[in-house]
From Swiss-Prot:
Family according to the record: Belongs to the universal ribosomal protein uS3 family.
GO cellular component labels: cytosolic small ribosomal subunit
Chain's role: Binds the lower part of the 30S subunit head. Binds mRNA in the 70S ribosome, positioning it for translation.
A single GO BP: translation
Assembly: Part of the 30S ribosomal subunit. Forms a tight complex with proteins S10 and S14.
Coiled coil: none
Segments forming domain KH type-2: 39-107
GO molecular function: mRNA binding; rRNA binding; structural constituent of ribosome
Underlying gene: rpsC
Organism this protein belongs to: Vibrio atlanticus (strain LGP32)
Classification via Gene3D superfamilies: 3.30.300.20, Ribosomal protein S3, C-terminal domain (3.30.1140.32)
NCBIfam families according to UniProt: rpsC_bact
The entry's keywords: Ribonucleoprotein, Ribosomal protein, RNA-binding, rRNA-binding
Pfam (any one): Ribosomal_S3_C
The protein's name in its UniProt record: Small ribosomal subunit protein uS3
Amino acid sequence: MGQKVHPNGIRLGIVKPWNATWFANTNEFADNLDGDFKVRQFLTKELQKASLSRIVIERPAKSIRVTIHTARPGVVIGKKGEDVEKLRAAVAKIAGVPAQINIAEVRKPELDGQLVADSIASQLERRVMFRRAMKRAVQNAMRLGAKGIKVQVGGRLGGAEIARSEWYREGRVPLHTLRADIDYATSSAHTQYGVIGIKVWIFKGEILGGMPAANAVEPKGDKPKKQRKGRK
């Protein structure tokens, strides 16, 4: 059943953080949620060319703090910070509270699921062959240290009359392992034949107790194990 559930959703609180970290009273929750949605929608539209990966929203003390994860921070900041100041003012107007914008650079875009999916989508819209785009993404991810990657595209591939899906995989992608750090993302390409959907799974390694599994130390306590064995 590992393929029947969202890979990011099932790992929240285990190896995946939330994209919105705030608490609210019952009468404020709906307004905050609606504000988050509008802020994300606005930033996604405004920063289409900035290689946007994630948007993390926090709400400390009647204000809003937005962290934008991007592979092209210069595009977001603009000359002398003019663009980011415009974004801050727009976000403050949408949310109705003072806003703060932070920029976080994505060092390896080839290992970011959302950026890989968006890259494949843009190539398909430029009429690059889908197999070439998929293989290029897989090779780049594995070259930069990914433990495994799977890429799937679906739709009227190559202009075919009957829609189908094809996928490539290299390395391991253990969807059943909750401690596996799997970056899952989707995107869509609007071609002259219709919409083509793209799904990307990138396995970066296993996380155990907040550290890589290779460096984890087994607990020294043996008493609970002895008690369980005694019951058997």
